[in-house]
Design a protein with these regions (language model features):
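Active-site nucleotide/adenylate-binding loops and adjacent lid/helix of ATP-dependent enzymes
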Residues: 1-100, 139-143
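A structural signal for short, well-ordered beta-strand segments
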Residues: 50, 66, 163, 182-184
Length: 251
């Protein structure tokens, strides 16, 4: 299974739990009084972030962002140890402080030629995952499927579904994927982290996202919903900042 904090971001505290001993270790390291989630492990290698938006009163919503995520790997050559492969890799070497500890029990192993060693479990760019802009891959069937899912959630108008899948063509057909997270108003259109995106493009996409968010917020206020007060927002923000350094190490 997968263990993760209920309150957090960028993959903080996410761990793969393979046995009862690992679960006990995770629970003992978790901050007291904080909530956590235990999820069934989804074995699919593919991961994507699907950002959905619908204004209150609209009959259907749309997908405004797709991010394809690729996990960091090194590949064996039959000569170098895993430690050497990590340190010699132009990208992984810069994040060796993350990977060496996670793979401490196998750093002296020599992977066979062509063997892929996945370096991180969490699909976060802070863990070395590569993000690619997939906005051109939206299909009507995919949009209809996510609209059905979003409209089944009471008052869900804006957010990112993080999914796992085996074949993205099936996702485009609206089939064969598993949602591992639903992120709400604090979510980000993560396609902006594609290295081919310019700073101006990233700013523009974020401003369009936040314009939609504030339009939805205004519509919901007009419908009678009370927004968080500034003090409430600060309290939640402070709580997240206090908890994040206390979570167990991220896989």
């Amino acid at each position: 299974m997968v263990a993760k904090p209920d309150l957090g971001c960028r993959g903080a505290g996410v761990q793969l739990v393979r046995d009862a001993g690992k679960l006990r270790s995770y629970l003992s390291a978790f901050p007291r009084g904080a909530r956590l989630l235990l999820q069934a492990l989804v074995p699919f290698e593919g991961e994507a972030g699907i950002f959905y938006c619908r204004r209150p009163g609209e009959s259907k919503g749309r997908i405004i962002s797709i991010t394809l995520k690729y996990f960091p790997h090194v590949y064996g050559d039959g000569r170098r140890t895993l430690r050497q492969l990590i340190l010699d890799d132009p990208r992984a070497g810069r994040l060796a402080h993350l990977y060496l500890g996670r793979h401490a029990d196998r750093l002296d192993d020599v992977p066979a030629p062509g063997d892929a060693v996945r370096l991180a479990f969490a699909g976060s760019h802070s863990r070395g995952a590569i993000f690619r802009n997939g906005n051109a891959m939206v299909t009507p069937a995919m949009e209809a499927r996510f609209d059905t899912i979003a409209q089944s959630l009471p008052e869900f108008y804006f957010g990112r579904f993080d999914i796992r899948f085996a074949d993205f063509a099936q996702v485009q057909a609206g089939q064969s994927f598993t949602i591992v997270e639903a992120n709400g108003a604090g979510a980000e259109s993560t396609h902006i982290w594609d290295r081919r995106t310019t700073l101006v493009q990233a700013w523009g996409d974020l401003m369009r996202q936040y314009r939609l968010l504030f339009q939805i917020g205004r519509a919901n206020r007009d419908r009678g919903f009370r927004p968080l007060s500034l003090s409430e927002f600060r309290r939640w923000h402070r709580r997240e900042k206090e908890l994040t350094p206390l979570y167990p190490a991220t896989d």
